[in-house]
């Protein structure tokens, strides 16, 4: 009986644990120690700094089963997923690692024992082939003389990629740094499958499959390309769980292993598919794994960075579900089955299951609204295509209008052997960016043209005034030697207490003054390494080289400090209340409010807003110390400091901590203790884009002012309702109930009036060939009452044709009613269409009742006058 995928994973970890390895949990799919990496894509990612000597662990041997995603950037397998036997967006990498401990001998012996040992994987030895780097005689001899593999099954691979050390069997972390030869182990599925051994012309076949790569990090590559031996060589290995499961379960495709077989059946169940060999089932089964685990690790669908990759994968899965005939949202229903097949490796996913399902369902519902229309447009374009390439402009229109990622369009085209002009798509995308840049300008911003060679030293963390020297002056973006009273200018100082706008915090205001002059600073901005004070010279004159006294508006700075510190508390509270997927997407901190944009998939519930507000105020009452430390970027990350993805940081960073509650990288100005904030109140929560929410809040005096404003408003409402704050709710409910009752009575009166009006109108009907025709424009009648009147008139008149109209504020409402015995000759829909066309509108309906609207009230009398002749012709 073959092992299950879960048993194989556990056996691997157990084996290396028995060899003295520390079992280390899988790290997040979102790398926390490498901002250049989109997703964790290898087992060694979490140990990168250990290999580089920047981090130390209390163990020298480790083993993991690491979750990995390859669906963006350099490692992009997306287009092949579902169509080949082994490509996935998500996979698990089994690995064992030595940090300066054992090396080639033990690494090879461990691998052989696990693969062929009777108590472990027990693979037939004659089915295993190995490759080594061409000059790695040591590894070759271990395989041949110690392990006993025949020479014909050991293959040397040289520099087969066109440069020294550029080889399938030489691993490099980058252009410089740790590197070394590797040995790979292949499994021979047998001669009934096409393919040749590695290094031969047929190596891309499916007969010989790489199952394990063992990297020997023994060199440090220098910038000039020379290789220096590492003092402590290390080992990094990787074996795809899905691949070894296919071997041990005696199947040729990863999609036939137990884990995927179960998922594919679940996909068929939720989509209604019956053909289990359909490749769309494989696509969806793969994609639910990457999507669910990415969301569990904090990624939310969006239009940028990791969120956009996730959105692309979700939409590809939804489109394949559509191809299978899925009528309703289905993708989120696969999270439960996924949790079931992942076993112990899915514990974190199980904890977040409901949240992951909600994110997937929301995203699927949003895309479903445009999917059908987008596919129809694409089908139309492809049906008219003369060549074999879809133009980039059309692909861009699908992206821009219907949210189709270009690779989804390429997926559809691929099924019809059509290519997509991706270069043309990129050109159209760049043109849109250019137009956006141009349309965002509201006139010349001369200050944006300022170029300053000098640097300014910011000293405003600890002081709000100091003496400085003017190093540059700019007027309308041009450098000048001096300015005079009344001139707008930018003043650059050698040092300053003024904070320049950065990280969402606005620039300081204040005054620069000196001997006979005063310069009012209205804003402060960065110009490269210089800090510019923007404002107007109120009096006197000022020249380059002159000394000034720089004074920041202290009261304004204090309010900004409180708001900025509250923003950090709120960020931490949001992650606690909503989940760790919450990430900052933008912020504004000024002296009046704080505004914070963050990733979240739905509007916050009132209870969640209250929980965040209460949590922040609880931290304020704790009066936590707010401390800053300058440290290495790596040390800051190790401390758990939150950083923004895509943001570039210096090697030395400023870490802001608020007790044990919040730690972030931040260069802004802050309160001394959380208690200084006083009070925190959320004013609003709203959406700004798909997957992005916005909170606006106030602190301190602003929070108290908002409480007073609400109290005053409640007092005014209470007086209007002749009540007080204690019974206000009861008074409002009573007033609303009374209002509903009065509206009901008013509606009844209107209906009675309509019936009376109908009785008066019936006498105005004329007889045309035995059918009563009534055409009338009614003044002061609500449009919705016309239908009631037509029904009543039809009962009164018998065989009849009725057209009623009313005009309110220039808008025309029309209705036509035809008794059923006349509809074979006159149809209400045709009649109302004829009238509506004359008043600038259109409409339709059933043969016996139809409604329309129009915009040309002046044309209504003539339109109604045309009805009699039109009806006569029909009868």
From Swiss-Prot:
Q: Which GO terms describe its biological process?
A: alanyl-tRNA aminoacylation; negative regulation of DNA-templated transcription
For this protein, what reaction is catalysed?
tRNA(Ala) + L-alanine + ATP = L-alanyl-tRNA(Ala) + AMP + diphosphate
One Pfam assignment:
DHHA1
Per UniProt, the keywords (alphabetical) are: Aminoacyl-tRNA synthetase, ATP-binding, Cytoplasm, Ligase, Metal-binding, Nucleotide-binding, Protein biosynthesis, RNA-binding, tRNA-binding, Zinc
Top-level division of the source organism's lineage: Bacteria
Per its UniProt entry, what is the enzyme's top EC class, as one word? ligase
Main site of residence?
cytoplasm
* Cofactor annotation comment: Binds 1 zinc ion per subunit.
Q: Which residues cross the membrane?
A: none
Q: Does the keyword Iron apply?
A: no
Which Gene Ontology cellular-component terms appear in the entry? cytosol
Quote the EC number: 6.1.1.7
Q: NCBIfam families, per this entry?
A: alaS
UniProt function note: Catalyzes the attachment of alanine to tRNA(Ala) in a two-step reaction: alanine is first activated by ATP to form Ala-AMP and then transferred to the acceptor end of tRNA(Ala). Also edits incorrectly charged Ser-tRNA(Ala) and Gly-tRNA(Ala) via its editing domain.
Q: How does it assemble?
A: Homotetramer.
The similarity annotation says:
Belongs to the class-II aminoacyl-tRNA synthetase family.
| Domain-related comment | Consists of three domains; the N-terminal catalytic domain, the editing domain and the C-terminal C-Ala domain. The editing domain removes incorrectly charged amino acids, while the C-Ala domain, along with tRNA(Ala), serves as a bridge to cooperatively bring together the editing and aminoacylation centers thus stimulating deacylation of misacylated tRNAs.
Supply the name of the protein.
Alanine--tRNA ligase
Q: What organism is this sequence from?
A: Enterobacter sp. (strain 638)
Supply the source organism's classification. Answer: Bacteria, Pseudomonadati, Pseudomonadota, Gammaproteobacteria, Enterobacterales
């Amino acid at each position: 009986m073959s092992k299950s995928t879960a048993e194989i994973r556990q056996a691997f970890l157990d084996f290396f644990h028995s060899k003295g390895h520390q079992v280390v949990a899988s790290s997040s799919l979102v790398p926390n120690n490498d901002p250049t990496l989109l997703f964790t894509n290898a087992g060694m990612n979490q140990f990168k700094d250990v290999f580089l000597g920047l981090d130390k662990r209390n163990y020298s041997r480790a083993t993991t089963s690491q979750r990995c995603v390859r669906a963006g950037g350099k490692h992009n397998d997306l287009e092949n997923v579902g169509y080949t036997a082994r490509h996935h967006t998500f996979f698990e990498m089994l690995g064992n690692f030595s940090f300066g401990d054992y090396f080639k001998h033990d690494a090879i012996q461990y691998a052989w024992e696990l693969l062929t040992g009777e108590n472990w994987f027990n693979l037939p030895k004659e089915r295993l082939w190995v490759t080594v780097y061409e000059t790695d005689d040591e590894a070759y001899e271990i395989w041949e003389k110690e392990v006993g593999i025949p020479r014909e099954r050991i293959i040397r691979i040289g520099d087969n990629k066109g440069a020294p050390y550029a080889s399938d069997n030489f691993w490099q972390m980058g252009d410089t740094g740790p590197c070394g030869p590797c040995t790979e182990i292949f499994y021979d599925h047998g001669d009934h499958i096409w393919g040749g051994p590695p290094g031969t012309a047929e190596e891309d076949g499916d007969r010989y499959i790489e199952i394990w790569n063992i990297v020997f990090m023994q060199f440090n590559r220098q910038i000039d390309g020379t290789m220096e031996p590492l003092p402590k060589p290390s080992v990094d290995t990787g074996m795809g769980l899905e691949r070894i499961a296919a071997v041990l379960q005696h199947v040729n495709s990863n999609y036939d292993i137990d884990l995927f077989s179960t998922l594919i059946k679940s996909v068929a169940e939720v989509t209604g598919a019956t053909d289990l060999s359909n490749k769309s089932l494989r696509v969806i089964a793969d994609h639910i794994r990457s999507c669910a685990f990415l969301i569990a690790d904090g990624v939310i669908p969006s239009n940028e960075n990791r969120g956009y990759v996730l959105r692309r994968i979700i939409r590809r899965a939804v489109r394949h579900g559509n191809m299978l005939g899925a009528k309703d949202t289905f993708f989120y229903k696969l999270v439960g089955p996924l949790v079931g097949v992942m076993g112990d490796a899915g514990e974190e996913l199980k904890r977040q299951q409901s949240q992951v399902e909600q994110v997937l369902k929301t995203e699927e519902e949003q895309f479903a609204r445009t999917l059908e229309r987008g596919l129809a447009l694409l089908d139309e374009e492809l049906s008219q295509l003369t060549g074999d390439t879809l133009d980039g402009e059309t692909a861009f229109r699908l992206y821009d209008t219907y949210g189709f990622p270009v690779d989804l369009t390429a997926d559809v085209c691929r099924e019809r052997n059509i290519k997509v002009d991706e270069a043309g798509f990129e050109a159209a995308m760049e043109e849109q960016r250019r137009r956006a840049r141009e349309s965002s300008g509201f006139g010349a911003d001369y200050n944006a043209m300022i170029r300053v060679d000098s640097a300014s030293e910011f000293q405003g963390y600890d002081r709000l005034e100091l003496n400085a020297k003017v190093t540059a002056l700019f007027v309308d973006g041009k450098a000048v030697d001096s300015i005079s009273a009344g001139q707008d200018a930018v003043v650059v100082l050698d040092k300053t207490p003024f904070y320049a706008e950065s990280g969402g915090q606005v620039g300081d205001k204040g005054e620069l003054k000196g001997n006979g002059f005063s310069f009012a600073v209205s804003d402060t901005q960065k110009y490269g390494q210089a800090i510019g004070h923007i404002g107007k010279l109120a009096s006197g004159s000022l020249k380059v080289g002159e000394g000034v006294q720089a004074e920041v508006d202290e009261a304004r700075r204090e309010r900004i400090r409180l708001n900025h510190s509250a923003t950090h508390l709120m960020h931490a509270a949001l992650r606690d209340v909503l989940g760790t997927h919450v990430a900052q997407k933008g912020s504004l901190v000024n002296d009046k409010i704080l505004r914070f944009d963050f990733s979240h998939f739905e509007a916050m519930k009132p209870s969640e807003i209250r929980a965040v507000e209460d949590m922040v105020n609880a931290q304020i009452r704790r009066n936590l110390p707010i401390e800053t430390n300058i440290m290495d970027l790596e040390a800051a990350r190790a401390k758990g400091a939150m950083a923004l993805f895509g943001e570039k940081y210096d090697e030395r960073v400023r870490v802001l901590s608020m007790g044990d509650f919040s730690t972030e990288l931040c260069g802004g100005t802050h309160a001394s203790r959380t208690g200084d904030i006083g009070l925190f109140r959320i004013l609003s929560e709203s959406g700004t884009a798909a997957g992005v929410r916005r909170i606006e809040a106030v602190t301190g005096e602003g929070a108290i002012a908002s409480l007073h404003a609400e109290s005053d408003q409640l007092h005014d409402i209470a007086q209007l309702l002749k009540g007080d704050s204690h019974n206000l709710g009861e008074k409002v409910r009573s007033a609303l109930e009374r209002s509903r009752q009065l509206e009901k009575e008013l509606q009844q009166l209107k209906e009675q009036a309509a019936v009376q009006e109908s009785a008066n109108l019936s006498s105005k009907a004329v007889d045309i060939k035995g059918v009563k025709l009534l055409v009338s424009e009614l003044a002061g009648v609500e449009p919705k009452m016309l239908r009631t009147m037509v029904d009543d008139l039809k009962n009164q008149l018998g065989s009849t044709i009725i057209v009623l109209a009313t005009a309110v504020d220039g808008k025309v409402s029309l209705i036509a009613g035809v008794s059923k015995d006349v509809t074979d000759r006159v149809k209400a829909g045709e009649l109302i269409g004829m009238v509506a066309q004359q008043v600038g509108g259109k409409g339709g309906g059933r043969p016996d009742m139809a409604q329309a609207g129009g915009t040309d009230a002046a044309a209504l009398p003539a339109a109604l006058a045309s009805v009699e002749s039109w009806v006569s012709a029909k009868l």
